């Protein structure tokens, strides 16, 4: 690609009473913005939901694995092709090759001991850990199946305890090539070896409500169906925190970087599927209790050549409650903010929208046509045929 290409995704989504992303106290996450408290859903939470959707969209081998249990993972692949190597030896070879490229490991004895609450609530997990002496990596690492299999193949034929400089370079190369789609999108890092870092091609903002929000509380009781007739009390009582809001969500995808990282994979298809996953995914927190899964009220996508532009400033002044709810005035505020911004700075190359409210500054279409249009635009841009919208729309 000769020119930079950024695809910015702006989404307004109304969510009913829910707790899709909670803090360490079980409360829905919040943020202070524009001097008022807003509902918040972390980018990490939404990226996990996107990756979960990728598992439904892409073949399993094209989606990466995030884990600290790298030794177990690599040892499994070693024994898959070399069953004559026993489990202990496979784990030893896996640890040796991983340490050679910069990974650090903690033995189970070095892991932090669980506190009293954890001892009471996580007995099964602790028992499993106590029976598994394989060390875990110090931090979660993102690895593709192809990379894991490649490094396992090298380790299988290396029974020594050290690697030469050239062998280490070959191992690093194996962990650089063939990244999964989600590694190419979300990036990864390893503190012990900067050569294994992959810069993310997509940026995802924390979603925040367009208006002020106060958390509410549901005092609930559970009935004990099997109790004595004279016992009319509840079997269990508790409190669940929740809120409801219209959220502004933003993500920006650097198509140029994504195309470079993927090295031959159909970049346009990946952009399309990311768009579908970002727009339609939903974090699963407390869904069984609240059934709060919704679809966006407004989707506004722009293509830019200069840089990503987050339009969250449209809601720095919190939307005031009205008889029209929050979604409609939020769409009006987003449209007006974008118009004002484009008068002062450069407007996007092209813009398309789904829903109601942004038709004045973007072409309105159905969701599936929007995905088709975006895919064609990216495909044509990669092929050097301009932005592609003229042919796609």
Label the model's feature ranges:
Residues 1-40, 44-393:
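Basic polyanion-binding and macromolecular-assembly surfaces
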């Amino acid at each position: 690609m000769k020119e930079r290409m950024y695809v910015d995704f702006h989404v307004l989504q109304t969510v009913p009473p829910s707790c899709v992303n909670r803090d360490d106290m079980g409360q829905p996450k919040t943020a202070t913005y524009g001097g008022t408290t807003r509902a918040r859903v972390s980018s990490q939470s939404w990226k996990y939901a996107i990756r979960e959707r990728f598992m439904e969209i892409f073949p399993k081998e094209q989606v990466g694995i995030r884990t600290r249990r790298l030794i177990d993972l690599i040892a499994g692949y070693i024994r898959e092709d070399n069953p004559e190597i026993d489990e202990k030896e496979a784990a030893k070879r896996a640890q040796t090759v991983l340490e050679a490229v910069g990974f650090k490991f903690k033995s189970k004895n070095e892991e932090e001991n669980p506190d009293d609450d954890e001892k009471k609530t996580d007995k099964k997990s602790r028992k499993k850990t106590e029976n598994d002496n394989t060390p875990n990596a110090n931090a979660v690492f993102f690895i593709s199946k192809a990379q894991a299999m490649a490094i396992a193949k090298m380790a299988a034929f290396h029974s020594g305890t050290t690697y030469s400089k050239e062998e280490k370079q070959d191992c690093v190369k194996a962990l650089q090539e063939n990244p999964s789609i989600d590694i190419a999108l979300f990036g990864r890092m390893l503190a012990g070896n900067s050569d294994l870092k992959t810069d993310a091609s997509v940026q995802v903002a924390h979603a925040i409500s367009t208006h002020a929000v106060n958390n509410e509380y549901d005092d609930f009781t559970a009935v004990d169906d099997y109790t004595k007739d004279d016992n009319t009390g509840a079997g269990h009582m508790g409190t669940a925190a929740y809120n409801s809001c219209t959220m502004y969500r933003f993500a920006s995808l650097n198509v140029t970087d994504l195309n470079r990282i993927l090295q031959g994979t159909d970049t346009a298809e990946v952009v399309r599927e990311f768009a579908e996953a970002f727009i339609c995914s939903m974090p699963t927190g407390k869904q069984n209790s609240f059934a709060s899964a919704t679809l966006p009220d407004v989707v506004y996508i722009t293509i830019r050549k200069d840089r990503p532009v987050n339009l969250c400033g449209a809601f720095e002044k919190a939307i005031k409650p009205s008889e029209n709810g929050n979604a409609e005035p939020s769409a009006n505020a987003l449209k007006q903010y974008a118009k004002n911004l484009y008068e002062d700075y450069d407007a996007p190359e092209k813009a398309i929208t789904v829903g109601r409210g942004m038709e004045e500054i973007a072409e309105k279409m159905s969701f599936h046509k929007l995905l088709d249009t975006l895919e064609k635009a990216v495909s044509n841009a990669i092929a050097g045929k301009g932005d592609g919208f003229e042919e796609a729309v």
